[in-house]
């Protein structure tokens, strides 16, 4: 989630610099999110169009953009797995999730009711999920001490509890079922339903 926000902020900065003439690019460059989704093409500014002020700025300030090589052409599909969210009412909601995305991000992108109040900074337990099958729980990396500290505060803690912001989609987790607890511990007013960030 935070990677996505940084990527959006970076692309906004690059667009603004290009629009104001502080950034010159040679050839068309693509900016990509970490999941390989196309964001935008930057305009081509010929070398002759530089003013002395632009030349000085570019000489004294370095800018760099990059993209993943697997998605530069935009024709390769990102590998995805299926994660099955089990909501508070017991309804199973299967979701396709790109490899490398957190469970919290996947929930927010698919309008699943998983809070994430601290925006994945390991400062709350509102993205608490319960891995329903021990087989899948054993495939996860061990939780860090920081995650365990936050899990101690989680509502309805179980032996297979994890924080959704710390569970990252990997091929071996294809088909994992994650239960969303019926409540969270947060300092919000009763009945308040926060919007995903």
From Swiss-Prot:
2Fe-2S ferredoxin-type domain: residues covered: 79-184
GO CC, alphabetical: cytosol; mitochondrial matrix; mitochondrion
Predominant place of localization: mitochondrion
Keyword Transmembrane: no
GO BP field: biotin biosynthetic process; electron transport chain; P450-containing electron transport chain; pollen tube development
Transit sequence range: 1-35
Molecular function, one GO term: metal ion binding
Free-text comment on the cofactor: Binds 1 [2Fe-2S] cluster.
InterPro entries: 2Fe-2S_ferredoxin-like_sf (IPR036010), 2Fe-2S_ferredoxin-type (IPR001041), Adrenodoxin-like (IPR001055), Adrenodoxin_Fe-S_BS (IPR018298), Beta-grasp_dom_sf (IPR012675)
Keyword Protein transport: no
Keyword field: 2Fe-2S, Biotin biosynthesis, Electron transport, Iron, Iron-sulfur, Metal-binding, Mitochondrion, Transit peptide, Transport
One Pfam family named in its UniProt record: Fer2
UniProt subcellular location: Mitochondrion matrix
Binding site for [2Fe-2S] cluster: 118, 124, 127, 165
Names of the cofactor(s): [2Fe-2S] cluster
Gene3D superfamilies: 3.10.20.30
Entry's family note: Belongs to the adrenodoxin/putidaredoxin family.
Job of this protein: Associates in vitro with the adrenodoxin reductase MFDR to form an efficient low potential electron transfer chain that is able to reduce cytochrome C. Functions as accessory mitochondrial protein involved with BIO2 in the plant biotin synthase reaction.
PANTHER family, A to Z: ADRENODOXIN-LIKE PROTEIN 1, MITOCHONDRIAL-RELATED (PTHR23426:SF34), FERREDOXIN/ADRENODOXIN (PTHR23426)
Protein name (database record): Adrenodoxin-like protein 1, mitochondrial
Species annotation: Arabidopsis thaliana
Lineage, uppermost ranks: Eukaryota, Viridiplantae, Streptophyta, Embryophyta, Tracheophyta
């Amino acid at each position: 989630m935070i990677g996505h926000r940084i990527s959006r902020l970076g692309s906004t900065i690059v667009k603004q610099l290009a629009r104001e003439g502080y950034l010159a690019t040679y050839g068309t460059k693509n900016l990509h999110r970490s999941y390989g989704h196309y964001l935008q093409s930057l305009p081509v500014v010929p070398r002759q169009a530089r003013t002395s002020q632009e030349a000085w700025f570019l000489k004294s300030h370095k800018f760099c953009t990059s993209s993943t090589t697997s998605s530069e052409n935009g024709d390769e599909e990102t590998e995805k797995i299926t994660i099955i969210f089990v909501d508070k009412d017991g309804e199973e909601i299967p979701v396709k999730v790109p490899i490398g995305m957190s469970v919290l991000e996947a929930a927010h992108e698919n309008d699943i009711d998983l809070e994430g109040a601290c925006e994945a900074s390991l400062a709350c337990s509102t993205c608490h999920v319960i891995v329903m099958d021990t087989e899948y729980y054993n495939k996860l990396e061990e939780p860090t001490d920081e995650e365990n500290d936050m899990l101690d505060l989680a509502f309805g803690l179980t032996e297979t509890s994890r924080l959704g912001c710390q569970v990252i989609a990997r091929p071996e987790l294809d088909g994992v079922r994650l239960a969303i607890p019926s409540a969270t511990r947060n300092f919000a007013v009763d009945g308040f339903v926060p919007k995903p960030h």
